[in-house]
Structures are given as structure tokens and as C-alpha cells.
């Protein structure tokens, strides 16, 4: 495959925030949750990590958790159920007078429920979507996805996240899987470039045992 060839987006992704933005390209890396910041992500250190969330990617067929507006713009409870208030407005109703043979409009009160703006919401402040902020990134959770590798992974075989110890070099990259070691393994479908492969993020292919 040529470097300038277009790749159709596939898979399902959600937006996650980096604990620390990688110095090199942040795309095509296996990621897990950060031990110091549990709600944020970091490149996987080895295939034995308890939780491999997915692979960072530029685009997928469907992206979740990337709202167009600030999600707390309106008051809500702890699980996100928005509070409503009864708002009375006047609406115009068109009627026809059969005796006088003409139409006229009169107003009557109308009750409806509206969301309650949050006291912390500033409508004058422009909201920037997560996908347009460098500290956030798409993570492919299921389906086919492209991941960086050391150039040695083969289609039809399995790969696993690189075990680099404390070194950050190539952390989150794929390497050929050691099938004699218990850990997360992922099926390689094809080689894309010299240092990228396509794999399948599928729960049915995780945690192969020796």
C-alpha cells in the first residue's frame, strides 16, 4: 500500500484524554489507563497490562463522546439526567370565522418544559470539540485498526504490545506475539507500510493462554 493511499475509516472509537501527550506521533499506539490519572490514558508498557483499552487512531466509522457543546451547559443530577422547568409562553392560534368569513389569529398561554442553564455555563465562550484538542484522542475499541509495529509482525499471525520496561521508546508499538507467555494477543490482518500493520480489536481474541 502506498503512503498516499486513502484508507476508509472503520471501527468504533471513543474520545479519551492523555495523561501525558506523547512526544512523537500519538496515533497507532496501544493505550491503557494511567495508574496516576485513572481517567486518562497512556501508551501500553507490555502485553501483561491488566487493561488494554484500544489503539489510538485518526478516524473511525463512528466516534462517541465527542459532543458539539459543553455537556454541563444545563443543570443535571449526578448521572446526567437534566433538570427541567415549566415555562409558560404565548402562542398564536389561527382560526376562521365562518360568519364573517375571515381568518384571524389570537393568542393563548402554552405550558412546556425547558432545560435549566447551568450557573457555570458561559454562552460567550466558544466551545472546542474534543477531537479538535491535542490533549484528547480517538481510541479504537473494536473493529479493524492500524497500529505501529517494529516491522516484524506478519499477517495471519498474532501481535502484542511492546514490552519496553521503563523506556518510552516505541512504547505502545506492536511486536510479534510470544504465544508461550500469557498476555493480550491481537490478530494481524495485513501489513500497511514498513512500520504499520492492520489488526483486529476483538474481545474474542484477547488473553490467549499458553
Segments and roles (model prediction):
Residues 1-210:
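Extracellular receptor-binding modules and their adjoining Ser/Thr/Gly/Asp/Asn-rich linkers
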